[in-house]
Regions:
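Conserved single-residue anchors adjacent to enzymatic active/cofactor-binding motifs
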Residues: 1-221
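Short, charged alpha-helical interaction segments and adjacent helix-coil junctions
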Residues: 2-6, 78-83, 173, 180-327
Length: 327
């Protein structure tokens, strides 16, 4: 079967996401998406794009590179991230990222009353987070500091919004709200060969115009292809890690289960060993497979001329690991 050539970019790729939401000429698209996400809780009238690369303090010199970083008209800060692969300490990373817009609000000098502007960290997740605190039936999760006894909001100016777009499975006929339409576009734009009636709202005029690959310059096409290759490699590495992890977990579980079964009874031992072994083997196998595949992805991205900062952001590798690849 002949493969259909893509007409529109994938917003799941680093290039596609930043082209649509991270450039000043397209800020109306970002504003529209944010307002659909907030659904009246917060109204964004305008944004000013800020430098997405933030350097840590003199003690850590640790950098944070955001996909999109901008400021609202009232000084509120928005960090918007697209995440395609699960990371063990992803919650920690989101919290760490939020410290940068907090610290940069402190003026130079000694006089300051510590009043802070609102900070929103928005993470769009192309995977299921499997967070125990979340309602598994929901796609959007809103996190704030609250009193654990009263469940009342303790501090309302630091918010984390996680959107598990991997769970979004509505068809075009089922799209009801602007938020639905944005999630559909985020997940499925690259699959479309023509603009559907369900996405004929005026705000999407610019989306389809900016996303049409045929209008790209040769350089933009090369950058998109490199970004698409990195995205595919990441997804393939996840699939491989899952498969290897399951195989190793099954083998280890059977071995351990049989050994324990000799002592405690074959039926009980096999059942327990399989469960524990598969869980441990899956986790270790996925971690090992992901790390090896990420090194391969990084090597290809560097060979295609992508800068080190972007490679680290996409693959999760450290600067020292990249230096070893270059060496």
């Amino acid at each position: 079967m002949k493969q259909v050539e893509e007409r529109y970019i994938s917003l799941l790729t680093d290039f596609g996401f930043k082209r649509i939401f991270g450039s000043a000429p397209n800020k109306d698209l970002l504003i529209c998406f944010l307002n659909s996400l907030f659904n009246g809780r917060q109204v964004v009238m305008d944004v000013k794009y800020l430098n997405p690369e933030n350097v840590g303090d003199i003690y850590t010199d640790r950098k944070a590179i955001f996909d999109v970083y901008c400021e609202g008209e009232n000084g509120e800060k928005f960090i918007v991230e697209m995440q395609n692969a699960y990371q063990t300490y992803f919650k920690d990373r989101a919290l760490f990222y939020s410290t940068f817009p907090i610290r940069e609000q402190a003026p130079k000098g000694n006089e300051w009353d510590f009043k802070l502007n609102h900070i929103y960290t928005i993470a769009l997740l192309n995977f299921n987070m499997n967070e125990e605190a979340f309602n598994k039936e929901e796609i959007r999760h809103h996190v704030q500091l609250c009193d654990t006894a009263t469940h009342k909001i303790f501090y309302d100016k630091l918010e984390f919004i996680y959107v598990e777009i991997a769970k979004f499975n509505k068809s075009l006929d089922e799209l009801e709200t602007l938020y639905d339409k944005w999630l559909y576009a985020l997940k499925n734009l690259y699959k479309l060969t023509q603009r559907p009636k369900a996405l004929c709202d005026k705000v999407f005029d610019r989306l389809f115009e900016e996303a049409e690959i045929a209008k790209f310059t040769p350089q933009e096409q090369r950058e998109y292809e490199a970004s698409k290759m990195a995205y595919r490699d990441i997804k393939n590495s996840i699939d491989t890690a899952k498969r290897v992890g399951k195989e190793e977990g099954l083998a280890e579980g059977m071995e351990k289960g049989l050994a324990e079964g000799m002592k405690k009874g074959l039926a009980e031992g096999v059942e327990k060993g399989l469960a524990e072994g598969m869980e441990k083997g899956l986790a270790e196998g996925m971690e090992k497979g992901m790390n090896k595949r990420n090194l391969e992805i990084a090597r290809k991205m560097l060979a295609n001329g992508m800068d080190a900062a972007t490679v680290m952001e996409i693959t999760g590798l450290s600067e020292s690991q990249l230096q070893q690849l270059k060496g």
